[in-house]
């Protein structure tokens, strides 16, 4: 199979689903249906077949790459006459709102933990590095939430640099999708994992395309392997609207929810509001900031209907 996109054709090896699935080799399935149920996101229908066909081959590839990096590190440590370093392998997962980045990240974390070479796999989302809600309001960025300028990039880069340098304990802020804000006084501690998975909208950006301060390093400078989860925009908008309706029945019904005022909407009213949010915020962010970084990824997972992967593109 070859990509229709000439840039992708030049940069990537392209696999149809069936071609990719055979690359699983003999990797055993380590997740049960209950495990998968716990990993699924809102409005996603990931099956064990999807894990077998797409994620097991990917976990095998990543295991081989991480092992090679570890072996190279041992050689370098021996050459330099130093103790083995504790620098983790960093995998980033990028893509649009509603594409399923979080589910992809959780499944990969669960699978990679079962390889004996790297049992400690941590997952951090960049949501926690969004400026606090009060700061976004003060800066006039509330309608730009998710855009690069809405993140505390200095804090994010300092976090990832500390993890990469092998610092014993590094704290990351935690985000609540209920309050639409950082959780004050709470944090996630990352303690020298073998692998760190970093999931977020803008983790593939560089100084070439970001409106924030370009004089300091970007997250992408610290990443060893990057994944972009891709889908056509009409599907992304559809999934966002479906997810919005699910949230209206679930998280929005919580009186503490920032979006509690949406809980009483009819389906038609909710669809109109979700479409407007997509057209004014998520869609423009995808077109301006997220999709242009796609071809920087080492691997692209292309989704079709029902969140099913249709193609995999692997950097040559």
Swiss-Prot record:
The main enzyme category here is: transferase
By sequence similarity, the record places it as follows: Belongs to the prokaryotic pantothenate kinase family.
Q: What InterPro entries does the entry give?
A: P-loop_NTPase (IPR027417), PanK (IPR004566), PRK/URK (IPR006083)
Concerning HAMAP family, the annotation shows: Pantothen_kinase_1
Keyword rRNA-binding in record: no
Report the locations given in the UniProt record: Cytoplasm
Q: In which pathway does it act?
A: Cofactor biosynthesis; coenzyme A biosynthesis; CoA from (R)-pantothenate: step 1/5
| A Gene Ontology molecular function term of the record | pantothenate kinase activity
Predominant subcellular localization, coarse grouping: cytoplasm
Reaction(s) catalysed by this chain, per the record, are: (R)-pantothenate + ATP = (R)-4'-phosphopantothenate + ADP + H(+)
Where ATP binds, per the record, is at 95-102
Gene of origin?
A: coaA
Alphabetically list the UniProt keywords: ATP-binding, Coenzyme A biosynthesis, Cytoplasm, Kinase, Nucleotide-binding, Transferase
Please give an example of a GO cellular component term from this record: cytoplasm
Enzyme Commission number(s) of this protein: 2.7.1.33
- Manganese as UniProt keyword: no
Entries under NCBIfam families matching the protein: panK_bact
Origin organism is Shewanella sp. (strain MR-7)
- Gene Ontology biological-process annotations: coenzyme A biosynthetic process
Protein name, as recorded: Pantothenate kinase
Matching entries from PANTHER family are given as: URIDINE KINASE (PTHR10285)
């Amino acid at each position: 199979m070859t990509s229709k996109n000439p840039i992708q054709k030049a940069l990537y090896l392209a696999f149809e689903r069936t071609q990719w699935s055979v690359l699983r080799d003999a990797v055993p399935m380590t997740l049960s249906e209950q495990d998968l149920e716990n990993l699924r996101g809102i409005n996603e229908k990931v099956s064990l077949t999807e894990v077998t066909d797409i994620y097991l081959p990917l976990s095998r590839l990543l295991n081989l790459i991480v092992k090679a990096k570890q072996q190279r590190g041992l050689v370098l440590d021996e050459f330099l006459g130093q103790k083995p370093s504790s620098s983790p392998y960093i995998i980033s997962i990028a893509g649009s709102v509603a594409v399923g980045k979080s589910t992809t990240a959780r499944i990969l974390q669960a699978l990679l933990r079962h390889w004996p070479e790297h049992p400690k796999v941590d997952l951090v989302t960049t949501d926690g590095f969004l400026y606090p809600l009060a700061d976004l309001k003060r800066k006039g960025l509330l309608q730009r939430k998710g855009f690069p300028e809405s993140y505390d990039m200095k804090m994010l880069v300092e976090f990832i640099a500390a993890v990469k340098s092998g610092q014993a304990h590094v704290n990351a802020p935690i985000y609540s999708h209920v309050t639409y804000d950082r959780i004050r006084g709470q944090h996630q501690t990352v303690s020298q994992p073998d692998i760190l998975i970093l999931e977020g909208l803008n983790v593939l950006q560089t100084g070439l395309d970001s409106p924030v301060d370009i004089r300091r390093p970007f997250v992408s400078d610290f990443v060893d392997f990057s994944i972009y989860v891709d889908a056509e925009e009409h599907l992304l908008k559809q999934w966002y609207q479906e997810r919005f309706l699910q949230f209206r029945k679930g998280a929005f019904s919580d009186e503490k929810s920032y979006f509690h005022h949406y809980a009483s909407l009819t389906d038609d009213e909710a669809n109109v509001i979700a479409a407007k949010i997509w057209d004014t915020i998520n869609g423009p962010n995808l077109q301006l900031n997220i999709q242009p970084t796609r071809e920087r990824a080492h691997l692209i997972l292309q989704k079709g209907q029902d969140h099913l992967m249709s193609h995999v593109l692997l950097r040559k």
